[in-house]
């Protein structure tokens, strides 16, 4: 039996506390403990949540989603769609500037959209439908489509990775498969690259020339007023160190407190423990389709009888069942497209013996399975430990490799075999909003080299995803979602491990925290 407290001690034993940054009064600086080290600063290149969160601070978007998840104008003053739905005419708000004080122009937006369209799951949909984009003048541009797509505004404004970050044309012309090196942004915060120390601190200063909308904040839409001169992300991978910092008023906000420490934090009179992201995070076990053994669908299927989602969730976030939800299928539980089609593969009786027999019959040849594990993210570390244990118990030859999250993000881009630095499997989580519908659900993509890490080729899933885009009503969408789920149980591009419902913790001196999704830093004030 694997116990969570043992996992916590093992994952934190070798970690040391970072030096706390100083230099500004607490009244004008927000001290935030993020979920992990900032491994990349390119919110188009990376799908990591930590990079997306960074991107939402540094870059603005043309549209933003309100609390009702409907797109609203953000950088745009307005837009018009032609009667045939093929031409979208966009007009920028006046006075928009990049962090180098250069004006935001139509051609910057076009270049940014083009780069994003090569990497993002919905951006790729735009790439298929795009006829052309052209600037009409510095403040206006057109997007011309081959066929109507009512979801374009939602895609351009969604807060999920990868965001359509608006950056200067010279930067946006960087190959989408190469990371940018210039972080001149358009958002309410300016990233201080000169003060960044990986594994220690990331610094964001309020961009004084940012033109916030003169209206109330509405999740990712509306005004984005900033009430702090500086936000410091203080990297603390050791949960005990982070907890002590929050209790001792050396930090204001902890994004991902460890479940074992929640009772202690709840008893502290100066700390609020609150769920910010109502949709939660779907845990997934992801496979590499390019190399043995998981290039063999029978090997992937062999794991299904051994997966007990409750065991995974208890290891990840504890036995308090308000912090997780099972069962979980392909789509986020509680959302309109969540369904029970074929779910008995995960909810039926669990059997290690059945899994062993299936693996023996699959043709598995004892190939080495490199399971990557992120030591600085306890939820992911614990999911990986349980997954590796299950694999070993049914007969896999597992090589469990621990690394920090940033290293894992880099390594999972390696498409080579395991003896050339590649990998076989890893565990991660996807935000509930991302995996609530087929359009933004990266783990179900089957478009080969352009798919998410693992790179599966699954024509049937691509066909069903295309059908979902064309669905005339919710009933049709639900039928397609059920078909998608059935195909996932056959192809097994990933295995859902349950829905994590993690709270955040912040000091009572912090108020007006924006709820509904990720940690956001506009509108937040010190009481």
Task: Please tell me what each predicted stretch does.
Residues 212-264, 397:
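Ligand-site clamp/hinge motif
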């Amino acid at each position: 039996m694997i116990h969570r407290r043992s996992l916590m001690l093992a994952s934190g034993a070798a970690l040391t506390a970072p030096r706390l940054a100083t230099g500004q009064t607490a009244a004008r600086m927000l001290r935030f403990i993020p979920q992990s080290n900032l491994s990349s600063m390119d919110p188009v290149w990376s799908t990591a949540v930590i990079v997306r969160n960074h991107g939402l601070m540094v870059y603005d978007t043309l549209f933003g989603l309100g609390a009702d998840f409907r797109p609203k104008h953000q950088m745009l003053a307005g837009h018009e769609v032609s009667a045939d739905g093929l031409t979208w005419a966009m007009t920028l708000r006046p006075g928009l500037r990049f962090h180098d004080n250069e004006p935001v122009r139509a051609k910057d937006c076009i270049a940014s959209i083009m780069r994003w369209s090569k990497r993002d799951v919905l951006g790729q949909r735009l790439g298929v439908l795009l006829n052309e984009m052209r600037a009409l003048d510095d403040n206006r541009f057109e997007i011309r489509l081959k066929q109507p797509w009512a979801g374009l505004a939602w895609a351009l404004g969604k807060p999920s990775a990868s965001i359509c970050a608006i950056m200067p044309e010279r930067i946006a012309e960087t190959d989408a498969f190469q990371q940018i090196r210039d972080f001149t942004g358009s958002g309410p915060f300016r990233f201080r690259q000169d003060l960044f120390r990986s594994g220690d601190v990331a610094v964001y200063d309020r961009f004084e020339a940012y033109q916030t909308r003169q209206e109330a904040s509405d999740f990712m839409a509306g005004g984005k007023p900033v009430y702090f001169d500086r936000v410091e992300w203080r990297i603390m991978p050791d949960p005990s160190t982070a907890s002590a910092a929050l209790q001792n008023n050396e930090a204001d906000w902890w994004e991902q407190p460890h479940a074992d420490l929640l009772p202690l934090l709840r008893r502290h009179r100066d700390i609020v423990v609150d769920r910010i992201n109502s949709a939660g995070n779907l845990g997934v076990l992801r496979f590499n389709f390019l190399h043995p053994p998981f290039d063999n669908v029978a090997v992937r299927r062999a794991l299904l009888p051994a997966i007990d989602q409750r065991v995974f969730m208890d290891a990840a976030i504890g036995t308090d069942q308000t912090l997780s939800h099972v069962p979980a299928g392909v789509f986020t539980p509680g959302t309109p497209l969540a369904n029970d089609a074929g779910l008995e593969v995960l909810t039926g009786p669990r059997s290690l013996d059945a899994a062993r027999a299936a693996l023996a019959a699959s043709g598995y040849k004892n190939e080495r399975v490199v399971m990557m594990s992120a030591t600085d993210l306890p939820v992911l570390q614990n999911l990986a430990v349980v997954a590796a244990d299950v694999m070993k118990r049914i007969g896999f030859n597992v090589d469990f490799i621990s690394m920090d999250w940033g290293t894992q993000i880099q390594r999972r881009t390696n498409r080579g075999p395991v003896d050339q630095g590649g990998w076989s499997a890893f565990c991660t989580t996807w935000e509930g909003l991302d995996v609530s519908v087929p359009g933004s659900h990266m783990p179900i993509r089957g478009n080969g080299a352009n798919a998410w890490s693992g790179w599966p080729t699954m024509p049937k899933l691509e066909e069903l995803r295309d059908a979902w885009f064309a669905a005339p009503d919710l009933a049709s969408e639900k039928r397609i979602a059920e078909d998608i789920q059935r195909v996932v149980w056959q192809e097994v591009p990933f295995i859902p491990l349950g829905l994590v419902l993690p709270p955040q913790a912040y000091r009572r001196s912090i108020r007006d925290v924006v709820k509904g999704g990720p940690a956001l830093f506009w509108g937040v004030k010190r009481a």
